[in-house]
Amino acid sequence: MAVWFSTSAVVPALTREWGLSPSGQAWMTMAVQLGFVIGALGSAVLNLADRIPSPRFFSISAFLAAFLTALIPLLSDGPGTAIPLRFLTGLSLAGVYPVGMKIMATWTRENRGWGIGLLVGALTVGSAVPHLANFLGGFKDWRLVLYSAAGLAAAGGLLALLFVREGPYATSAPKFDWGYALRAWRNKEITLANFGYFGHMWELYAVWTWAPVFLAASFDLTGIPGRWSGLAAFAVIGA
């Protein structure tokens, strides 16, 4: 998940180099969210996570996200190419986050909540890693941050390919049927649970995008070296 907020961590540098407008800055992150939503819906409709072995699907998606992220410092000279690459990165991450949840669920049953919570915590720290990379040296060159994030994503994909397998509680899913969605809407308990879940992290992702920019501006005003804002952002998001 390090690639998700990789460009968000270097937006100030990209703004200086590419002359990003405020909307361009926002789209560097929003494109990922949009790609993820479309990818997750498409994956669900096509039953990709059940038709392709989950560890393999996870690995392919992680490798693709890493490749697309690395293309930005290699090829991009502005938002015209970077934003589509970010959208495709989000599309790829739809095979990482939800599929990782599925794999974890196959290894847990009574303690499934603990297992999913552990995975979400790991994903959260991973999302914050680009800011740590910024602190450790990426502040001098934004490309190092993106290469670091891409490298971590590729390493995660390789580990999943070599060592991760579905657990003993794996079940085969039925064929996708639009009728299930209609029946779910008729079930009051499920409908209320769904409404509680829809958009459940919109405010958190907004803060994760805004906080590093706020910290960088605050540190700049107080004369604190800018690289320290990366460490502060890592602590805020990772905690």
Kindly label every feature range from the protein language model.
Residues 40-78:
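Conserved MFS/SLC helix-loop-helix module at the cytosolic interface between two early adjacent transmembrane helices
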